């Protein structure tokens, strides 16, 4: 897919759009509709955070600590700590294209305005994609069930000026990569840390890239098989349309 700029407007992404950003380095921008959606949602979260009411994920602990109240002046520290505590992946780093796919999928999710994050968060992710800052994300640490928590935590730490990243084909501290690219890291406010890791964007990225590869392989298989049939001067009676209509399999019919 060739597209100069992918504008995230709060709608869903197609597989080819993810691949365009992940592999072809298509630029990403955040549309005005998405900015309004995110700002409206963040206004609600901020109102809850300043109301004095205990609300999970905003001013409480997480999991077993859900009944522990967190003081308002420690909410940024709370959100940073959930990123640091979950950045526990191991193994070889994921390929750059997988991480870039994660980044655009995460940005698109935030742009829906249902996560309560500020527009700046998605805008920084887009800026990282456009300037070539790619977080180093270990390949092991998630099965994509209740969320790719560890991989996304490694990604989000770079967004916040921590962790490790690739920039200019060199691995360096996330803070240095952001600095060299001229990107200002964010300091996550209420709920943003949770919003950054509570998703299955790694699995979705891997699936998008795998589907693109499968489509290419299927086309190659069909073409090479047709050429082999022609070269061998084999019969083509097995391609009779009536046979394949009887099977009611759309893929089989298309190949035939």
Task: Pin down the residues of each PLM region.
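Conserved, well-structured ligand/cofactor-binding cores
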Residues: 1-256
